[in-house]
């Protein structure tokens, strides 16, 4: 019968694999070892964050980032992320404190804790005048948190790892330093010959993202020549 066949099949499998390997019962609770708990050269730790695991136990997972001479990771990059996490929790609670969350968002966007409007105004960042004019035409008069956090390290040529929610200006965050440098080079070499090799290469994982990156660079700097290259099209 079918039941007898299954019993025989289970017996054969158990005899080959071993019953002890099929049913393993831990003799004592297993604890997770948070990575990079002890100080290590070349790493800087971020504040631990609680995560729930199976069985009700919890562990503190500590994120870390390389802090080499030419690399940087700014705590300002994660300031907005903490606010978005707060927004999610407020939605779960029914949204009673949405106004409080919006006030905190406005404080960050207005430069709260890191400078005022004058400091974040694009006209006071040392950007080329024609770049400032095109940004202002698009309604961009001051930087968002992610843009503020990466601007100086990017202009210094340092490696950056940052994260922010969709729609918070991540693409323009790295596009502004690129446009600034290319514009200044063009102004210093007005008589240089055309037909040079590409000076900047931006890699994107998808065709749609590649098009988006080109748009974000081309709109504030129409005087620069950009080319979007992708495959998969007949």
From Swiss-Prot:
Pfam families: DEAD
Q motif (motif): residue ranges: 120-148
Keyword terms of this UniProt record: ATP-binding, Helicase, Hydrolase, Nucleotide-binding, RNA-binding
Induction remarks: Down-regulated in response to mixed metal ion contamination (cadmium, copper, lead and zinc), but not in response to zinc ion contamination.
Entries under InterPro entries matching the protein: DEAD/DEAH_box_helicase_dom (IPR011545), DEAD_box_RNA_helicase (IPR050079), Helicase_ATP-bd (IPR014001), P-loop_NTPase (IPR027417), RNA_helicase_DEAD_Q_motif (IPR014014)
Residues annotated as binding ATP: 164-171
EC numbers on record: 3.6.1.-
A single GO molecular function term of this UniProt record: RNA binding
EC top class named in words: hydrolase
Coiled-coil ranges from the UniProt annotation: none
Disulphide bonds in the chain: none
Ranges where the Helicase ATP-binding domain occurs: 151-234
Family: Belongs to the DEAD box helicase family. DDX21/DDX50 subfamily.
Domain topic, free-text comment: The Q motif is unique to and characteristic of the DEAD box family of RNA helicases and controls ATP binding and hydrolysis.
PANTHER family documented for this protein: ATP-DEPENDENT RNA HELICASE DBPA (PTHR47959:SF1), ATP-DEPENDENT RNA HELICASE RHLE-RELATED (PTHR47959)
Name of the protein: DEAD-box ATP-dependent RNA helicase 3
Organism: Helianthus annuus (Common sunflower)
């Amino acid at each position: 019968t079918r039941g007898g066949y299954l019993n025989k099949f289970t017996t054969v499998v158990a005899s080959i694999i071993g019953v002890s390997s099929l049913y393993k019962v831990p003799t004592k609770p297993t604890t997770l070892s948070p990575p990079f708990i002890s100080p290590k050269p070349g790493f800087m730790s971020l504040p631990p964050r609680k995560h729930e695991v199976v069985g009700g136990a919890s562990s503190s997972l500590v994120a870390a980032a390389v802090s080499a001479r030419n690399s940087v990771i700014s705590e300002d990059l994660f300031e907005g992320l903490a606010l978005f996490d707060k927004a999610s929790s407020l939605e779960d609670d029914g949204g009673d404190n949405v106004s409080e969350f919006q006030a905190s968002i406005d404080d960050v966007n207005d430069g709260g804790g890191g400078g005022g409007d004058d400091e974040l105004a694009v006209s006071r960042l040392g950007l080329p005048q024609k770049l400032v004019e095109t940004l202002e035409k698009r309604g961009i008069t001051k930087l968002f948190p992610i843009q503020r956090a990466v601007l100086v390290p990017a202009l210094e040529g340092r490696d950056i790892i940052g994260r922010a929610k969709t729609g918070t200006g991540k693409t323009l965050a790295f596009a502004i330093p690129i446009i600034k440098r290319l514009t200044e080079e063009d102004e210093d070499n007005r008589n240089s010959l055309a037909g040079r090799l590409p000076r900047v290469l931006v890699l994107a994982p998808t065709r749609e993202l590649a098009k988006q990156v080109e748009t974000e660079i081309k709109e504030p700097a129409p005087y620069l020549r950009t080319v979007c290259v992708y495959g998969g099209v007949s």
